[in-house]
Amino acid sequence: MSSYAPREIPLDIRLMQGTSRALFWLVALGCLFVAGHWLMQRNWWDIRAVRLQGDLQRISPVTVRAEALPQLRGNFLTINLAQAQRVFESLPWVRTAVVQRLWPMQLAVTLQAQQPVAIWREPGSAAQLVNTQGQAFTANLGEVQGLGLPQLSGPAGTSAQVLQMSQKLQPLMQEFHQTVATLAQGSGGNWSVQTRSGLSIDLGSAPDSAATQTRLKQFMTLMPQLEARYGRSIDSVDLRYPNGFAVHLQGVDLPGMNKTSNKTPQPAGRKD
């Protein structure tokens, strides 16, 4: 019985077979790609509803339909969820948004609303609001009328710092039945506050220092006695003095009050 060794396929034929197989798979993949692209572009995949959930107290569905939905690009399969998230987060009163696909052909959008705690002003810019994180955001100020929000102001980008200072001062003010109405940090670093009763207080450059806090408490304690003594309300007080404070009464100017010296006190950090 004879046996035959398998014939070796010539190199040119092997190359032709390999090329044919490669071309076949390329054509097959191309057809699949074209078919997939065609399927994804059909209106079968159009987004048919957007479900809003979360904190919607200040977020109007009308605003969402008018401003957000026209900016969404793609269908259920092709929409870029990160880009859609940015669209929703650009809406007034929206702090964060989470966008997810929801079968069949829907988007679920979970919104977290901004929580305003103050009105913010900085040089050269329109008034904004400040949220609980100290971030300034733009919204219709008319929507917060009646909330009694304090007004804060300072250099650009300092909203968080000014809000933090306001929160430090408020408990001390409340001890003396006062409430912060405005707090401002000037370009030179000095701070001033006005209470809802109309009292203006110049706090100097370190309002949270122990020395300033002590002088503020001393003044608040003496304020009723001073007003009773002079028969007038106090308009303003300057706490930038190392050993006391200076007050201004309605219609009366006082030279300065210093408990340790008869001479007119100088603002802290200043020499005669």
Curated annotation (Swiss-Prot):
A single GO BP: FtsZ-dependent cytokinesis
Name the record gives this protein: Cell division protein FtsQ
Transmembrane feature ranges: 21-40
Main location: membrane
Domain annotation POTRA: ranges: 45-114
Range of residues in the leader sequence: none
UniProt topological domain (Cytoplasmic) ranges: 1-20
Assigned keywords, A-Z: Cell cycle, Cell division, Cell inner membrane, Cell membrane, Membrane, Transmembrane, Transmembrane helix
